[in-house]
Structure formats: C-alpha cells, structure tokens
Amino acid sequence: MVKIKNIEEIVQNSEVLYNEPLRKYSFTKTGGNAEVLVKLTNEQDLQNVIKYSNENSIELTILGNGSNVLISDNGIAGIVAITSDMNKIELLDGDVISCYAGLTLKELTDFCIENNLTNLEFSCGIPGSVGGAIFMNAGAYGGEMKEVVQKVEVFTKAGEKKIYTNEQMEFSYRHSVIQETKEIISRVYFQMKKGTKEEIISKVEELNKMRSDKQPLEYPSCGSVFKRPEGYFAGKLIQDAGLQGLTVGGAQVSKKHAGFMVNIDSATCEDYKNLIKEVQKKVLEDSGVELECEVKILGE
C-alpha cells in the first residue's frame, strides 16, 4: 500500500480525516473506515485530489450523499473524497441551472421551487446527490435526469477538465457513459422551463406523499436495490416469491415495499450482500428472472 502523506498541503479549504468511520456517511448506516477521508468544499480541491491520487497510484473513491451504495465492512483503502459540501448552485440566463455535484436533489428541488422552474419535480424525494443522480441517470415517477441535463463537466483520471453534452453522456436506464469512463462529475447544467410556484409545489407534495405512503422511510436503507427487469417490476417479483420480511442478520426485505432492503438491527454490509444474493437466487428459481443490482458496493 502506498503511504498517503502531505495530502493536507494540496487542499485549501477541505477537511482531511484519517481512519474515519464511513457508516456516518451512508444511508444504510453500514461500512468500515476510510483510510483517508477528504470532505471537499470546492472544485479546485477536487481537481488537486484527483491529480494527487493519479500521480501517486492511490485508489480514489468518490462518495456523494451515500444513498445508493453499500460500503464494505472492511472500509475503503486509499482516499475517499466526499462531495456533499460541494453544493453551490446558481441560475444562469435562459433558465439554466448550474450546480456542483455534491448538491442534494432535495436542495435542487427547493431551488427550482424558489425560482419557479419546472421539470425536475420527479427527483424531489430521491435521496441522492446531483453527481450520483447523473452517474446513474436516476429517475422516478416517469422522469429521468437525461430529460433535463444540458451538459456535464467532469475531471478525467489525470485531473483534466472535460465537458459532455447530453447526447455524449449516452444516457439509458440507470446508465451514463461515466460508468465506463470512470471520470468524476464536478458540475452539471440543467435546462429548465418556467412554471408556476403553486403547480410545482403541488406536484412535489403529491410525489412526496406517494413516496412516504409506499416506501419504508422510517428505516435506514440504500433505496431501490435492483434495476427494473424488462417487462417486470423487481419489487413485484420479490413479493410474489414470498420474500417480504426475509431477514439476514440485521438486514431485511422491507415489509412495506419489497424493492427495498432496510437496516432493522445494526446490519452489516455483509448482511446486505448475503440478503441480496438470497433474493436473487429465490426470484430466479420462482420466476426465471435474474435481478441486477442497482446499488453499488464500495470497498473490498
């Protein structure tokens, strides 16, 4: 393992922590420690950390809001850079929103309401960051990020800035080209439309109610665990296989919504991984459908 040293010298306004528990930054409240954790506050520090990692052959893991990931119980070696404090947002000419990758989707939705901008209401309850949402082409209730993204700024592994148009992002279901290039999203531009505040608020409230009625928001979870198989719904397949309430350690298939796995009693990442495997196995036996994970597993 390469010794990580002098990293404080390359960041100006970002905190550096050693052997930091990552469960504090995970929606599932699971995971071991980060060898080194950098709490990024600005784009320059992000670029410096990327260059430092590349030049010193150190593994770099980017973590946004920690909502669609499972973090290994063994933690993550190398550097973990958290973008949640990189959250500046502004309104540009032509109803374009510019924001950094660490902004939460709730903060983005609130900004849209404040400025009477529509078309992002679908994202109001997705518990993620803008960067993660673009990486996964997140969507809900009939909307997807690909419908509103104008362009995306990224850093290459060498720390060079690059811009992708919407078309170049190659968006598809829970996919963007960044999953192949392994580049790091820094800033996103959204092409919005003017709306009326009352209608936007009404839509957001409607979707939030639907979410709270159907989803197990009272427990820590990583959100929807599996991608939607073509022609099916993952939650329905799991429910039909009689797996609601299935528990491994402290992780459980939600009794409220079978597409979710919740932490009901100090679950570990290993509990989640074993529960995922068991559900995949039993759904395949029951319906012949192979469930593919939407959740990303970080660390070894």
Q: Could you tell me what each predicted segment is?
A:
Residues 106, 136-138, 167-173:
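Short acidic (Asp/Glu) patches
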Residues 31-32, 37-43, 70-88, 135-166, ...:
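Structural signature of FAD isoalloxazine-binding scaffolds in flavoprotein oxidoreductases
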Residues 112, 130, 134-138, 153-156, ...:
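Short, well-ordered alpha-helical segments in soluble proteins
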Residues 17-18, 155-157, 161-274, 278-282, ...:
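Phosphate/pyrophosphate- and phosphate-bearing ligand-binding catalytic cores of soluble enzymes
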Residues 113-150, 221:
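A gly/ser-rich beta-alpha-beta helix-loop segment of oxidoreductase catalytic cores
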Residues 2-130:
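Anion-binding (especially nucleotide phosphate/pyrophosphate-binding) glycine-rich loop
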